[in-house]
């Protein structure tokens, strides 16, 4: 995570929210070209009934996720390290084995760091890249570089191995339903799903605009200059982002997620409603509504994280990061031993329901 810690960018919050709220036409997009990018502003979820919720809860497996997705990522994986390559290969292989016909892209680039030029590689996995609109789930797969201490290495379990594993489990558990996006009668559905695994979120030395967010800064600029749909004039891949849902620092017990952005509040409220429904159906483990995950308060600033380069370009953001941060943040204790299985399992169910409702599956 969020190498900026709890330093909010209060001074720029109002400017960033203003940019995010601007209609595309005021940013140089012609009215005709802006028609489909505006559809996200009116999009409504298809609310699932209790039978469907039970089916989703039964279809996700925390033990399978733990063994097959998470544990291989609990290694040192700072950019350019052997562990970074291993993590990247693991993520790609887990996606390639699925039936839903994901299209994988590796965005590799060089960037100056405090240690000279380093290579970074973002992983972009997209269902139906030609679909105009995509719901985007994202996290970072790099771990922060720390010197070894007492033969221990920093594996960043919450930061952000667990979010990566949650996204992989979502793709596995919903594979058959996501496959239907490719096989619907309309050969090119208007709305689909994209997963982004950022490299280089963490600072090598001290968090700064230059030493942080390497992967997201590069990818946001690249997507802003890439026409979408292919050959379009006036709209880019960023216009095709309905909502960027960024997961970070997840896996510790009793997380509390505030709402960060007013323009995505209705989607945050949907997460609250899903959490409540799953609780009422008895589908959440060790869960109390008195200490629910998605809280009824707004955060008075912006936490520095991979959403920032996209926020500045007007992409709607749903930032799923707890406040306060886990106690183990940026310590050697951010490891498997200190993860809470029930919390992760519950959040898996909530996120999977959210995605299916958003995509009308």
Predicted segments with their positions:
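Secretory-pathway/membrane protein signature
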Residues: 1-361
């Amino acid at each position: 995570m969020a190498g900026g810690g709890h330093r909010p960018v209060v001074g720029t919050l109002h400017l960033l929210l203003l940019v995010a709220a601007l209609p595309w036409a005021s940013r140089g997009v012609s009215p005709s070209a802006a028609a489909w990018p505006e559809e996200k502003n009116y999009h409504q979820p298809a609310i699932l009934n209790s039978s469907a919720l039970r089916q989703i809860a039964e279809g996700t497996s925390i033990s399978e996720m733990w063994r097959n997705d998470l544990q291989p990522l609990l290694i040192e994986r700072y950019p350019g390290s052997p562990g970074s390559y291993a993590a990247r290969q693991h993520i790609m292989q887990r996606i390639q084995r699925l039936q839903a016909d994901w299209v994988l892209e590796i965005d590799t680039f060089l960037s100056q760091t405090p240690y000279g030029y380093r290579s970074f590689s973002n992983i972009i996995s997209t269902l139906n890249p030609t679909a105009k609109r995509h719901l985007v789930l994202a996290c970072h797969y790099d771990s922060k570089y720390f010197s070894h201490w007492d033969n221990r290495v920093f594996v960043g379990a919450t930061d952000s191995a667990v979010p990566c594993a949650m996204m992989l489990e979502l793709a596995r558990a919903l594979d058959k339903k996501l496959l239907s996006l490719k096989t619907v009668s309309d050969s090119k559905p208007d709305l689909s799903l994209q997963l982004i695994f950022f490299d280089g979120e963490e600072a090598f030395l001290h968090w700064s605009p230059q030493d942080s967010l390497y992967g997201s800064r590069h990818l946001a600029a690249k997507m802003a200059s890439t026409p979408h749909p292919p050959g379009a004039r006036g709209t880019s891949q960023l216009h095709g982002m309905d909502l960027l849902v960024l997961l970070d620092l997840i896996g510790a017990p009793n997380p509390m997620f505030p709402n960060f952005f007013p323009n995505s509040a209705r989607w945050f409220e949907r997460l609250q409603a899903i959490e409540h429904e799953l609780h009422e159906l008895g589908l959440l483990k060790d869960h109390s509504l008195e200490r629910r995950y998605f809280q009824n308060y707004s955060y008075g600033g912006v936490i520095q994280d991979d959403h920032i380069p996209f926020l500045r370009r007007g992409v709607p953001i749903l930032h799923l990061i707890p406040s306060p941060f886990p106690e183990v943040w940026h310590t050697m204790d951010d490891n498997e031993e200190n993860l809470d299985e029930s919390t992760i399992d519950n959040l898996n169910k909530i996120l999977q329901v959210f995605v299916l409702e958003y995509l009308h599956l």
